[in-house]
Amino acid sequence: MKPICIIPARSGSKGLPDKNMLFLSGKPMIFHTIDAAIESGMFDKKDIFVSTDSELYREICLERGISVVMRKPELSTDQATSYDMLKDFLSDYEDNQEFVLLQVTSPLRKSWHIKEAMEYYSSHDVDNVVSFSEVEKHPSLFTTLSDEGYAIDMVGADKGYRRQDLQPLYYPNGAIFISNKETYLREKSFFTSRTYAYQMAKEFSLDVDTRDDFIHVIGHLFFDYAIREKENKVFYKEGYSRLFNREASKIILGDSKTISTSLESYHNYSQGGVTLATMLENLPNFLTANVTEAFVSIGVNDLITGYSVEEIFSNFQKLYSLLAENKIKMRLTTIAYTLFRETVNNADIEKINQWLTEFCYQNQIPLLDINRFLSKDGNLNYHLTSDGLHFTQEANDLLQSQYQLFVDEVKTL
């Protein structure tokens, strides 16, 4: 018997109206859960059910090719519980029917979380599997307040307090609930002594209940650079198309740091935020037979996006091979250090730069170490950066002159 998936989506949220359908990263929030269920590969589409009281929700959710069940009016009130809804929904199924409840308010849960949790449930003798996350703030630091406003339960709480000595505590994060009809209806709960806690990391466990929660999730998705790169594929493709110059014989391949760079006789294909990986995907589309030289300064966005150092090595090799096959001479710069940036560290940049130095030496590729001009004590100079990653105008002017000297010197060799 195949498992079924149930996604509750009542329309009457008062704290955050229509929270289940609010647009999040380009699609209704409920679609993040529907898509995760589909992509898990654990259900037939017809066995993924949205339970709702809204005809509008129904109409939109059907666009995903799944099933929608309209709730009875008495199951659509604030007083109706999840148990009430599930008891009614499961009434026509066999007692051994396995089901998965996915709450819309956990939009960061991934398809592989669902798959892993279901595989554990199927292969172990447990009553239920429920997703849990570690508590960030330990309850030993929680307190009630007296009528006068005193923290009466906290007396001496900081004496010898060491977070690392406290036993980790976990809470159900609301993302995944797995059981079967007989067990759940008998216990009227997903929590028994035989409920297995499927652990999920904090970054996947955000729960949307209030507007602040929703803004938090928006911020999380905005700063998920891997998702951003995927979503921006078309944007970058169109950008290269707009920049296309069939007559260009010398080109600049870079990111936001070289957008303003102007080298004599060079056409600039730089785009802000682009990775070496994305640039490589698009390069054949604008690499004409006229191109003879390429000035390349790129790579830090690959680290920010989450590419490994080894993947970046490989992509630089692919770039060199592609240019060499087309008899295009390559001029390269190192990657500039950063300063106090959470998304990238200079140890990785140094590894890549050391590799580039050796690679360029072996293949006789001219290499300009821009950190000679920009760094201080192994970091990007504070006075030459606007945000720890990008350059000030002073730094751009300095690099402009150094880049021109570099290509001019190479020209005379």
Swiss-Prot record:
**Catalyzes what?**
an N-acylneuraminate + CTP = a CMP-N-acyl-beta-neuraminate + diphosphate
EC main class here is transferase
Q: What is its main location?
A: cytoplasm
- Please state where this protein is localized: Cytoplasm
The entry lists its GO molecular-function terms as:
N-acylneuraminate cytidylyltransferase activity
Write the Enzyme Commission number(s) for this entry: 2.7.7.43
Q: Which GO terms describe its cellular component?
A: cytoplasm
Entry cofactors: Mg(2+); Mn(2+)
Q: Is the keyword S-adenosyl-L-methionine in the record?
A: no
Going by the UniProt record, its keywords in alphabetical order are: Capsule biogenesis/degradation, Cytoplasm, Exopolysaccharide synthesis, Magnesium, Manganese, Nucleotidyltransferase, Transferase
Annotated SUPFAM superfamilies: Nucleotide-diphospho-sugar transferases, SGNH hydrolase
**Gene Ontology process terms (BP):** polysaccharide biosynthetic process
Pfam families the record matches = CTP_transf_3, Lipase_GDSL_2
Family according to the record = Belongs to the CMP-NeuNAc synthase family.
Q: What does this protein do?
A: Catalyzes the formation of CMP-N-acetylneuraminic acid (CMP-NeuNAc), which is essential for the formation of the capsule.
The protein here is known as: N-acylneuraminate cytidylyltransferase
Q: Please give the organism.
A: Streptococcus agalactiae serotype V (strain ATCC BAA-611 / 2603 V/R)
